[in-house]
Amino acid sequence: MFPKYISGIVQVGNLQLGGYNPIRVQSMTYTDTNDIDATVSQCVRLVNAGCEMVRVTAQGITEANNLALIKKGLKQKGNEIPLIADIHYNPRAAEVAAGIVEKVRINPGNYSDKYSPGIILTEKAYNEELERIADRLRPLLQICRQNGTVIRIGTNHGSLSSRIMNRYGDTPEGMVES
């Protein structure tokens, strides 16, 4: 048996995660984020089922902006739960969402680069890619800092970049390095 590890506390909207706080329940909508009413209704059903936070996909800037309308619709229905924006492939959508929601989930494997099989990078090109990714991430970090928005880094095997796949393969090390 492993000793119990007490993590630090993270504030997500009106909820605290970690420390001695209870495990929090989160789910994700499957509605089209452009359908505001359907997404608000699904969020309300999730809250009524016990969710304390709801994740909503924001594939583009339009969907990221719609998060404000979803948040407003939830507030009108008496639900002020933390919303989480789920972002893939679109750093600008993440930046827009970070000014609206309480938490942004990004995947480093597809935040700013897509998978292109067969690409092998030299050490110099690999390091240039890392710097390019860092440059794309800095504006998001600044917006999150200004708004008190939490960032969740979520990685999985299905979204490792070419840079990672060619260096580490589809391995746990690749997920960590991602």
Task: List each language-model region with its residue ranges.
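Alpha/beta enzyme core
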Residues: 2-56, 61-83, 87-178
